[in-house]
Design a protein with these regions (language model features):
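Peripheral peptide segments
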Residues: 1-148
Length: 148
C-alpha cells in the first residue's frame, strides 16, 4: 500500500477500483435507492464524478451495510464510524468482501478518512493507493482538478 498526494497517476491506468466512505448527508427517503443516489455529501459526489471520469468502479465502505457497490439498493440510516473500535469491528466483514472483489483490479484507490481506511489495514497490498491530503478541502480541490 502506498500513500499518494496526486490523482493524475490514475488517468488511463487500466482496471481501477475506487473505495470511499459513506456520507453523513443522505437523501431523506423511506424507499430503497441506489447507494450513489442516497449519499449526498459533497465529497461523495466528487468522488463519484471522478470515478466516472476515469471509468473506474466505485464501492463504498458503509458503516451500516459494509462494502457496497454504488448500485446497491439501501435505505437511509444514521450510523457512522465514530471510533477506531467501530472500524475494527467492521474490518473483518470489509476484508472478506474485498477479498472476493479486488482480484480483478490493477489498482485500488482509497479516498476515505482514517477510520474508513482502518477497515482495510489487513487486506491492502501493493495495488492499494491511499490519497493523503491536508484535509477535505484539499481532497475536493484535487478531485475538481481531475474532473475538469
Amino acid at each position: 500500500m502506498q500513500e499518494i498526494s496526486d490523482l493524475s497517476f490514475f488517468q488511463d491506468k487500466g482496471n481501477v477500483l475506487i473505495l470511499t466512505g459513506c456520507s453523513k448527508n443522505k437523501l431523506n427517503t423511506e424507499q430503497e435507492v441506489p447507494a450513489e443516489e442516497l449519499y449526498t455529501g459533497t465529497l461523495f459526489r466528487f468522488v463519484k464524478e471522478y470515478a466516472d471520469s476515469i471509468n473506474a468502479d466505485l464501492y463504498i465502505i458503509s458503516a451500516k451495510y459494509g462494502l457496497i457497490s454504488r448500485n446497491t439498493l439501501i435505505k437511509t440510516y444514521d450510523k457512522v464510524l465514530r471510533t477506531y473500535a467501530d472500524a475494527e469491528s467492521l474490518r473483518p466483514e470489509i476484508e472478506r468482501e474485498l477479498s472476493l472483489l479486488h482480484g480483478g483490479y490493477d489498482q485500488i484507490l482509497v479516498i476515505a478518512g482514517d477510520k474508513y481506511r482502518r477497515t482495510l489495514k489487513g487486506i491492502a497490498d501493493e495495488r492499494y493507493y491511499f490519497l493523503k491530503t491536508s484535509g477535505i478541502g484539499h481532497t475536493l480541490h484535487l478531485l475538481k482538478e481531475q474532473i475538469s
